Amino acid sequence: MSKAAIAEKEKLVDAFAEELKAAKAILVINYLGLTVEEVTNMRKDLRDNDVKMKVIKNTYLRRAAAKAGIEGLDDTFVGPTAVIYTDNADDITEPARIVSKYEDDFDVIEIKGGMLEGKLTSKEEIKELASIPGREGLLSMLVSVLQAPVRDFAYAVKAVAESKDEDSAE
């Protein structure tokens, strides 16, 4: 292999290592069996939510993970592998939610494992995480809970006012 080709591959590994280092959530999946259209749709859904998906040779993944200081994912870099990751600290559940949706829709996708905020995460933990609503969903639930007492009080005041109006009309 020429020195230029080796240097190009080293650049690829270094660039990916930097992306992995910045990632708040990393998922490793087996995507074998998806059609090109299905992979394209999944990539679009991921991109729309500020999540990236890369398919890179497993040897490059191992090297990039080692350079990024990520340990424990080497056993997931076997067979057809895609790495899904985000550096968005606001919602680290989004990659898990999107991949779980596709895993449910297409039996061929398999979540191999991942890392969330530097902690090794199993497939089961990722599935649990996917069931948690996103940041926006949690905020809307919080607002709804906070509004409930005020809304109930407003209904009570309105009911009292209406009953007084009925009493004065009689």
Swiss-Prot record:
InterPro entries recorded: Ribosomal_uL10, Ribosomal_uL10-like_sf, Ribosomal_uL10_bac, Ribosomal_uL10_bac_type, Ribosomal_uL10_CS_bac
Entry keywords, A to Z: Ribonucleoprotein, Ribosomal protein, RNA-binding, rRNA-binding
GO CC terms, sorted: large ribosomal subunit
Keyword Ribosomal protein recorded: yes
One Pfam family this sequence matches: Ribosomal_L10
Chain segments annotated as coiled-coil in the UniProt record: none
Keyword Ribosomal protein assigned: yes
Gene Ontology MF annotations: large ribosomal subunit rRNA binding; structural constituent of ribosome
A GO BP entry: translation
Record HAMAP family: Ribosomal_uL10 (MF_00362)
Function: Forms part of the ribosomal stalk, playing a central role in the interaction of the ribosome with GTP-bound translation factors.
Stated family: Belongs to the universal ribosomal protein uL10 family.
Subunit structure: Part of the ribosomal stalk of the 50S ribosomal subunit. The N-terminus interacts with L11 and the large rRNA to form the base of the stalk. The C-terminus forms an elongated spine to which L12 dimers bind in a sequential fashion forming a multimeric L10(L12)X complex.
Listed name of the protein: Large ribosomal subunit protein uL10
Organism, scientific name: Lactobacillus acidophilus (strain ATCC 700396 / NCK56 / N2 / NCFM)
Name of the gene this protein is made from: rplJ
